[in-house]
């Protein structure tokens, strides 16, 4: 009898939960339509993989790419609509969040063709790879629109779990296993630190979890200047710092970059920074509104350390992927300048503009590395010597992307940095801007050192890897070359037509 009553209660509770979930999806589902497209794509991938043989592999790529493109299209159709809060305050839709979601979708769309031939050559499992990429993209999109502490924690965990699995995708590689273990342990520790910071914020605000309600709660409890808020700020900064990987939270980055499959590194190097930047701007700007001086100081310290350490240590690297890892640490220092400037003086607009260019520059560089690695099997910088004599197209593409990363005119990277530094100068961040300019000069040095190797390697310097290099013809429909061409063009031409891009960024935010 007791069991019968308990069983009935369980059925009633389950029915209520299901009906509530259905009600939320029915009335709020249109506000997450781009995310729903990705979920449908994930389900379709699983269905096709479980009901077909290996001959349908092209369909898997087609479905993944199509779902990403359709999600981008849905975002563009929803552009400039009024801000909306859905799912009982857990998710917010506005132009600011959507522009970061667009950048994440753009990263994933470019990374899939970048990975096709690599997966086929290394005989990796294709379906799981695509599932992890789409799920990580989904987690990043939800993080961009997260409006409460629970969603801000769960969404990046969804992204992080997929990142751990992707970084250890080549199970037989010892370096990949080592990178995954370090990534997992440090990721778990940072998540614990982040949750601890959230608990201080939750308690200080009187039990509120929505970002704007936390501000109101801090006013009601008169705790906005309390030591508890300072403790919360420190713990949350450390937790978010792992996702952004500025110094000194950068220890995992070089090892993960070196040990993980190169297409995975390309994906993680851009999507994690875009999603974490979107989350950081909202967390620092809303709940810590009354502690702006404190978090400005913390971020300034992180930016200075990142720009100096990242660019100086990159000079000494012999691995191309480790060099780009330290370069990315320096690049995030520039992005932090835009976060500090904020709404005033176009700080967010300059940050978004630079991130758009950084995506094309970084993915273009990684496309060249993937192509060179598949044809030679090496990642050593010295082995790039004399590549221009064997493959001028690849050498020129890599040189353009590296020059754009360094910030040389008239490439996109130069104008992106110029706009970012100008906004920082107008906001009074003179010391940060000067450090940024000096470290940019340092970065140009190690980029030019690689370009010199590419173009002027003498016969005695050319390694057997390049001497035996075989270039595949362009007519082979190489998907990596397609991604590389798109990224090289995006790293070059937008610098000439900068004003429309800046106008779009400003118009979408303000």
Curated annotation (Swiss-Prot):
One of its GO terms (biological process) is photosynthesis, light reaction. GO terms for cellular component: chloroplast thylakoid membrane. Its main location: plastid. It holds the Pfam family Proton_antipo_M. Keywords: Chloroplast, Membrane, NAD, NADP, Plastid, Plastoquinone, Quinone, Thylakoid, Translocase, Transmembrane, Transmembrane helix, Transport. Signal peptide: none annotated. It comes from the Eukaryota. GO terms for molecular function: NADH dehydrogenase (ubiquinone) activity; quinone binding. It catalyses: a plastoquinone + NADH + (n+1) H(+)(in) = a plastoquinol + NAD(+) + n H(+)(out); a plastoquinone + NADPH + (n+1) H(+)(in) = a plastoquinol + NADP(+) + n H(+)(out). It is found in: Plastid, Chloroplast thylakoid membrane. Its EC number is 7.1.1.-. The chain crosses the membrane at residues 24-44, 57-77, 99-119, 124-144, 149-169, 183-203, 227-247, 295-315, 323-343, 354-374, 395-415, 418-438, 484-504. It is a multi-pass membrane protein. PANTHER family: NADH DEHYDROGENASE (PTHR22773). NDH shuttles electrons from NAD(P)H:plastoquinone, via FMN and iron-sulfur (Fe-S) centers, to quinones in the photosynthetic chain and possibly in a chloroplast respiratory chain. The immediate electron acceptor for the enzyme in this species is believed to be plastoquinone. Couples the redox reaction to proton translocation, and thus conserves the redox energy in a proton gradient. Belongs to the complex I subunit 2 family. NDH is composed of at least 16 different subunits, 5 of which are encoded in the nucleus. This is NAD(P)H-quinone oxidoreductase subunit 2 A, chloroplastic. The lineage of its organism: Eukaryota, Viridiplantae, Streptophyta, Embryophyta, Tracheophyta.
